[in-house]
């Protein structure tokens, strides 16, 4: 249906705008009503978009003709009239209609006579005034063919099943669910719940690539003692960035450096795209560090598309840069103070409120550019390029009256929904909400103002109570008692108390406790290393996980100080932080991925991906996690990587009835494996290993830890296409820690075979396969026996001897006979 609506918009956009003479006298005009239907034909019960109107455009985007109707004659000759409808300024509009009978419908637009009066400016800014009477008209009847069988729509494309990269073809619309962006370098709790939608978040520690952050040397200094280079904690945070359309942009230097630069890296490949100071004509803007990112969805009469920006700020001045090149685009001055909220089209909103005076205003980055523009907005890019805008002059969408003297301050905002404020003290909690949704009534209307009497223990114990977390998706807010380390929850649909106090946490959490609400669950972590998950609506403890320090490395407590860094795809990722760690850093700090439903460990790396307290923490986009590891101050990309399978079979034929050996290799061919360092260590390629072996294996491959002795390989399926054309699986094997696999098999028929070795993929690798071939011959044929005399040993030796003896006797006899004759 979205496609149909887009087609209607395109059709209406191409209609010419009326050219109005300046100060024209009242006149009249014949009209020519039209009607179209898409799709046509259509299946019964399927929705049709009717295109109705006249080919006359009006002068401003908010104007439209009114009272249009559609006369429908059904296949059974009954009629109905649908409408009335108002057109947009093009003179046309789209109407949804669902036929319920099989057969031919007849559709006809009726345009009623009406005046259109206009005083203002034409497209070029010239003053005009006109009065026009548009006369009544009927469109020709349109036949709509409704058939019994439904028509087919575009089938859509499946999500990727093999390694993918950017850019993503726009036709692969379904892929938006795995290609979200990350727009805030260091999310500020409790305003941001660390939630990252539209991701297939990693379920193993597989590393795609790594590179130095570029600030200083990292890791162990060496040559002096066991200490390492400074990591920016405390007060001089390193890293921090955003990810837009598969490109990671991060701050190269720590926050205290006078000269700053931003690095752009392809998140999928690790390729550096550019490094530069965010400046214009050599003049640096602000502190040169990325403040936040933006992806704006722009739509005008003649142009629709997304525009992305990297924002640098300095006080009330904002500077926009093009992510593709790092070039400056435009500035805004006099931006009001406040918290950034992203609107439905990616616009950045801020809310100004005066509770004493009783007013509320919404400021909008898009309105700074577009509001009160003469003519029509042709394209966003050309309107902002190279310009500076005063954000105070025309950046406000509206300013409305609200009840005076609302207590406390604004706590959370959901644009186009509501704004929630609260006052919290030792004796009372008062929560109120104002409407921001025009479909639910006047903007600024008070939705509720609810007071709750606090327990006496708050005042008696001089407890510090703060607003810990809130979610307008789950409609829950929680307060935290710092000293008692328990929660109190409130319903944000009405401000009423829900539950509390929760059982107290371990004592160290009074020094640092991080709370987030996502998927209907409140997750807490902190200095105590005790991660707990509660049902946000009821307070029921669902699970808890303790990040134990089994080797007594961490000097503050028995468990690792942990904080949530990402919540995405039903998982919560936590990393170890410390306010101002001693050197050498404690060894073995974990990075953990937990199933948010069960608390089960999805994967965990001990001694890798250590986080920072003052710099940029882990972020996720395109289903890949990007982070800086403070152990070596390198940037890592964590996600599913490509694999490569090879297979070999005997090159010479084998005899039917004999066995042959099929062998091959399965390797990791992620971008990080192509460096000289890894090529030197793994000349035959980096072996692909099992998910359960991945954390220790990645430490060995990329961090030079000892090679693990219990590494397991991956399953390989072997199949053949035999000489009869039959495809069949012949068995399975598992590769070893070197990536090598072997399989013996006895072919059962003669002829040529194609053999397939297939790796189905895992949470760490995309699938791969390879082919080879071999031939099976019949055994050699044995010839039939010939009738030949067989000579025995007797024949060979005795017979010749006898014959010789006989010959001698004959000779002797002859000699004797001659002698006897001679005597006579």
Regions found by a protein language model. Give the residues of each.
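Residue-level recognition of secondary-structure-to-loop junctions
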Residues: 88, 94-101, 105, 111, ...
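Enriched for extracellular/lumenal, surface-exposed ectodomains of secreted and cell-surface proteins
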Residues: 101, 105-132, 749-768
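Short beta-strand segments of immunoglobulin-like
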Residues: 37-42, 649-654
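Structural beta-strand segments of beta-rich domains
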Residues: 46-50, 658-662
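Repeat-blade elements of multi-bladed beta-propeller folds
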Residues: 161-162, 166-182, 186, 224-262, ...
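Short flexible loop/turn segments that cap and initiate beta-strands
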Residues: 55-83, 204, 209, 672-729
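Secretory targeting signatures
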Residues: 1-26, 52, 205, 326, ...
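Proline/serine/threonine-rich low-complexity linkers at boundaries of modular beta-sandwich domains
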Residues: 21-32, 636-644
């Amino acid at each position: 249906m979205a496609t149909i609506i887009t087609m209607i918009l395109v059709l209406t956009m191409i209609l010419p705008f009326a050219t109005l003479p300046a100060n024209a006298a009242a006149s009249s005009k014949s009209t020519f009503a039209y009607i179209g239907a898409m799709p046509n034909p259509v299946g019964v019960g399927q929705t049709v978009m009717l295109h109705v109107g006249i080919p006359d455009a009006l002068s401003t985007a908010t104007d439209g003709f009114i009272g249009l109707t559609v006369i429908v004659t059904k296949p059974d000759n009954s009629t109905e009239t649908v409408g009335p409808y108002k057109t947009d300024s093009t003179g046309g509009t789209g109407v949804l209609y669902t036929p319920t009978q099989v057969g031919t419908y007849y559709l006809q637009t009726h345009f009623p006579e009406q005046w259109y009066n206009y005083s203002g400016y034409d497209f070029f800014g010239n003053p005009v005034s006109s009065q026009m009477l548009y006369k009544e008209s009927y469109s020709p009847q349109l036949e709509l063919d409704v058939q019994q069988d439904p028509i087919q729509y575009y089938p859509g494309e499946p999500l990727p099943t093999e390694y993918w990269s950017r850019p993503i073809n726009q036709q692969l619309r379904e892929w938006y669910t795995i290609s979200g962006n990350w727009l805030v370098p260091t999310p500020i709790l409790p305003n941001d719940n660390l939630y990252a939608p539209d991701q297939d978040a990693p379920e193993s520690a597989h590393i795609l690539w790594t590179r130095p952050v570029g600030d200083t040397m990292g890791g162990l200094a060496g040559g002096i003692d066991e200490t390492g280079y400074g990591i920016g904690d405390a007060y001089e945070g390193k890293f921090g960035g955003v990810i837009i359309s598969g490109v990671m942009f991060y701050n190269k230097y720590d926050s205290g450096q006078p000269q700053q630069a931003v690095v752009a890296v392809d998140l999928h490949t690790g390729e550096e795209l550019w490094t530069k100071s965010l400046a214009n004509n050599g003049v640096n803007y602000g502190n040169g560090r990325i403040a936040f990112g933006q992806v704006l969805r722009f739509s005008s009469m003649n142009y629709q598309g997304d525009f992305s920006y990297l924002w640098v700020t300095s006080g009330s001045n904002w500077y926009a840069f093009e992510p593709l090149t790092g070039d400056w685009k435009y500035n805004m001055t006099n931006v009001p103070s406040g918290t950034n909220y992203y609107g439905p089209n990616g616009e950045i909103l801020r809310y100004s409120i005066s509770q004493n005076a009783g007013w509320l205003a919404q400021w909008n980055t898009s309105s700074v550019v577009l509001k009160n523009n003469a003519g029509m907005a042709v394209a966003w890019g050309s309107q902002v390029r190279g310009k500076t805008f005063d954000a105070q002059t025309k950046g406000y969408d509206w300013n409305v009256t609200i009840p005076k003297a609302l207590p406390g301050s604004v706590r959370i905002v959901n644009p186009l929904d509501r704004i929630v404020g609260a006052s919290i003290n030792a004796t009372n909690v008062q929560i109120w909400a104002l409407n921001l949704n025009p479909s639910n009534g006047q903007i600024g209307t008070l939705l509720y103002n609810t007071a709750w009497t606090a327990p006496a223990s708050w005042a008696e114990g001089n407890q510090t109570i703060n607003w810990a977390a809130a979610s307008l998706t789950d409609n829950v807010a929680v307060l935290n008692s710092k000293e008692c380390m328990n929660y109190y929850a409130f319903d944000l649909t009405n401000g009423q108390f829900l539950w509390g106090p929760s059982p107290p946490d371990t004592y160290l959490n009074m020094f640092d406790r991080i709370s987030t609400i996502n998927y209907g669950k409140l997750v807490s972590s902190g200095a105590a290393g005790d991660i707990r998950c509660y049902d946000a609506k009821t307070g029921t403890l669902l699970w808890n996980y303790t990040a134990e320090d089994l080797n007594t490395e961490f000097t503050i407590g028995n468990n690792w100080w942990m904080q949530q860094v990402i919540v995405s795809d039903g998982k919560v990722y936590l990393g170890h932080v410390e306010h101002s760690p001693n050197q050498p850093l404690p060894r073995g700090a974990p990075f953990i991925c937990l199933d948010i439903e069960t608390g089960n460990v999805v994967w965990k790396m001990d001694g890798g991906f250590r986080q920072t307290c003052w710099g940029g923490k882990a972020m996720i986009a395109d289903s890949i996690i990007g982070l800086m590891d403070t152990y070596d101050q390198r940037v890592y990309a964590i996600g599913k990587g490509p694999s490569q399978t090879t297979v070999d079979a005997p090159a010479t034929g084998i005899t039917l009835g004999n066995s042959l050996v099929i062998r091959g290799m399965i390797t990791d061919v992620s971008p990080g494996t192509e460096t000289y360092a890894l090529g030197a260590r793994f000349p035959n390629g980096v072996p692909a290993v099992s998910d359960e072996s991945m954390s220790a294996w990645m430490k060995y491959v990329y961090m030079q830890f000892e090679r693990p002795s219990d590494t397991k390989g991956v399953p390989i399926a072997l199949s053949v296409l035999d000489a009869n054309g039959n495809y069949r699986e012949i068995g399975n094997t598992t590769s070893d820690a070197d990536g090598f696999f072997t399989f013996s098999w006895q072919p059962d028929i003669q002829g040529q075979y194609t053999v397939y070795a297939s790796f189905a993929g895992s949470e760490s690798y995309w699938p791969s396969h390879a082919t080879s071939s071999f031939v099976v011959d019949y055994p050699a044929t044995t010839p039939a026996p010939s009738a030949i005399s067989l000579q025995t040993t007797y024949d060979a030796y005795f017979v010749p001897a006898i014959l010789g003896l006989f010959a001698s006797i004959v000779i002797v006899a002859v000699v004797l006979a001659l002698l006897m004759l001679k005597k006579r």
